[in-house]
């Protein structure tokens, strides 16, 4: 029986020499791989009390939407700046070479709501830290951060240590 890890393609030396790129597209382009990935992520939410799934653009949408659908929960988009039409809250965070800004609609999370943040991959944790701060600014509580893949060598869990962080597959390197 195949595991999610069996569906993840590894591309050496991309985007630069010494990096082992973990390609999630090989998971979602295979019907069995996609179903297994979503099922494994849903299992990690079993018994958890939460109200909303929020996903980070763009692959957090890919995994968050089917989870929200399967569990009959609303889905909230965490988008790059300038992509949402209504009033937003925003957070700028550091990248390796510069900064990025993400936004959420001001009415997307209600005070007291329990939120699960979803993305395809955790590396340094910067995007999810910013997303969590947006949820908290809106009065929500982040009860879990859920990823398909973790690049443990980049220490994202350390940045997110105050949260419940879970990943289906973990790789030691970068």
Curated annotation (Swiss-Prot):
<comment type="pathway">
    <text>Purine metabolism; AMP biosynthesis via salvage pathway; AMP from adenine: step 1/1.</text>
</comment>
<dbReference type="InterPro" id="IPR000836">
    <property type="entry name" value="PRibTrfase_dom"/>
</dbReference>
<protein>
    <recommendedName>
        <fullName>Adenine phosphoribosyltransferase</fullName>
        <ecNumber>2.4.2.7</ecNumber>
    </recommendedName>
</protein>
<dbReference type="GO" id="GO:0002055">
    <property type="term" value="F:adenine binding"/>
</dbReference>
<dbReference type="GO" id="GO:0016208">
    <property type="term" value="F:AMP binding"/>
</dbReference>
<dbReference type="GO" id="GO:0006166">
    <property type="term" value="P:purine ribonucleoside salvage"/>
</dbReference>
<comment type="similarity">
    <text>Belongs to the purine/pyrimidine phosphoribosyltransferase family.</text>
</comment>
<dbReference type="InterPro" id="IPR005764">
    <property type="entry name" value="Ade_phspho_trans"/>
</dbReference>
<dbReference type="InterPro" id="IPR050054">
    <property type="entry name" value="UPRTase/APRTase"/>
</dbReference>
<keyword id="KW-0328">Glycosyltransferase</keyword>
<dbReference type="GO" id="GO:0044209">
    <property type="term" value="P:AMP salvage"/>
</dbReference>
<dbReference type="GO" id="GO:0003999">
    <property type="term" value="F:adenine phosphoribosyltransferase activity"/>
</dbReference>
<comment type="subunit">
    <text>Homodimer.</text>
</comment>
<keyword id="KW-0963">Cytoplasm</keyword>
<dbReference type="GO" id="GO:0006168">
    <property type="term" value="P:adenine salvage"/>
</dbReference>
<dbReference type="InterPro" id="IPR029057">
    <property type="entry name" value="PRTase-like"/>
</dbReference>
<dbReference type="GO" id="GO:0005737">
    <property type="term" value="C:cytoplasm"/>
</dbReference>
<keyword id="KW-0660">Purine salvage</keyword>
<keyword id="KW-0808">Transferase</keyword>
<dbReference type="Pfam" id="PF00156">
    <property type="entry name" value="Pribosyltran"/>
</dbReference>
<comment type="function">
    <text>Catalyzes a salvage reaction resulting in the formation of AMP, that is energically less costly than de novo synthesis.</text>
</comment>
